[in-house]
């Protein structure tokens, strides 16, 4: 048997590794709805990220002496109530995703059907990763340390929003506030239900709604210059800017 101090130290170490993996999600083309379709190497990279996250989650759960009572790493004592709250959260998330898509892009951009399997993987895998780490481990540790509930909720949401921003490269204030709201709602649901099931269900639905409304890859501004045809002057040259590239 591992001595308890060493066991807890290992728990903190593996939790830190999982946090670092979340920060490095962009390198694996994972954890964001706007990743490109790609060849098998890209898919292998994405799957390795989700697989590593699941493995770390299992190790963390095994190492902590009281993962259920202290970290709420369980579905919920009342699963029916948790499921109802999760679906309600998801419904609000769907509405929010459509509003956000119109606000940011001016229109809804539905992805091609061939991208749906990746969208499902993104939604379910990332929601589990985030809820386990941020609403389970991190939020639970903040409560164990004696922080008031409101301060623990705000701190966990702030750290979560910063981690998502670092891991996806998004820089907009609107998206940052969006992740903050997701973090706050998830933590509140954990307090209400005693588990992460409601937060996971609602988060997964919300992320899939993001994929459905903003699922086509974001691209940086690209400058393309066509060969000039004789006698055409500059007619053959054109620039495609950020506003000229549509999602869809």
Place the predicted regions along the sequence by residue:
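Membrane-interface helix-boundary motifs at transmembrane edges
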Residues: 32-41, 106-114, 170-173
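Alpha-helical transmembrane segments of multi-pass integral membrane proteins
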Residues: 53-60, 85-100, 121-130
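Helix-boundary and loop/linker segments of multi-pass membrane transporters
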Residues: 4, 74-78, 108-116, 145-146
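Alpha-helical transmembrane segments
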Residues: 3-13, 78-92
